[in-house]
């Protein structure tokens, strides 16, 4: 049995590959996302993306911030071998919108902004508002879980090396913004 720290360090690349793949899917095949969540209206990269390039015993970190940030610098980093290590996402379903950040190394979700829950006018409304807020968090978490399950199925399939990786390389090399 692997020690937890050893397993963490050994497999943390999967989260980074997941986020890199997710960026590719968001840009190139948003219809694929709808097959995973039919109620999905859109999934977009939010106001922050972090990439890391681990080369020659060094670490280069590229952070792109801002609501209108251009992602060309991030794609250039991908061309040089970087992977996405953190990504802010905007998930829209129906008339509701969630914003949150995923860290690749742990798949930790943070900075949650959920749709507004119902207003609390009486003490009896409080329990319902708490349950509704928990439900709203759970919807986004389940969506990310489904995305990751789909990624893992692809990652261990023969399609990963023969089809997906070449498509990602083609996208990175042809990216125009």
Protein language model features and the residues they cover:
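Intrinsically disordered, low-complexity, charge-rich terminal extensions
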Residues: 1-177
């Amino acid at each position: 049995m692997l020690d937890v720290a050893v397993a963490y360090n050994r497999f943390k690349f999967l989260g980074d590959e997941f986020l890199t793949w997710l960026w590719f899917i968001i840009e190139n095949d948003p219809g694929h996302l709808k097959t995973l969540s039919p109620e999905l209206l859109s999934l977009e990269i939010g106001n922050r993306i972090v990439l890391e390039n681990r080369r020659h015993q060094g670490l280069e970190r590229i952070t792109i911030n801002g609501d209108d940030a251009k992602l060309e610098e991030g794609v250039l980093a991908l061309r040089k071998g970087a992977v996405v290590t953190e990504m802010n996402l905007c998930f829209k379903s129906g008339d509701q919108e969630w914003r949150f950040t995923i860290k690749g190394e742990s798949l930790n979700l943070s900075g949650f902004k959920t749709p507004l829950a119902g207003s609390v006018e009486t003490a009896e409304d409080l329990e319902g508002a708490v349950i509704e807020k928990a439900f709203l968090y759970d919807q986004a978490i389940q969506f990310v879980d489904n995305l990751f399950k789909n990624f893992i199925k692809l990652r261990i399939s023969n399609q990963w090396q023969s089809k997906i990786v070449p498509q990602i390389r083609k996208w990175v090399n042809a990216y125009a913004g």
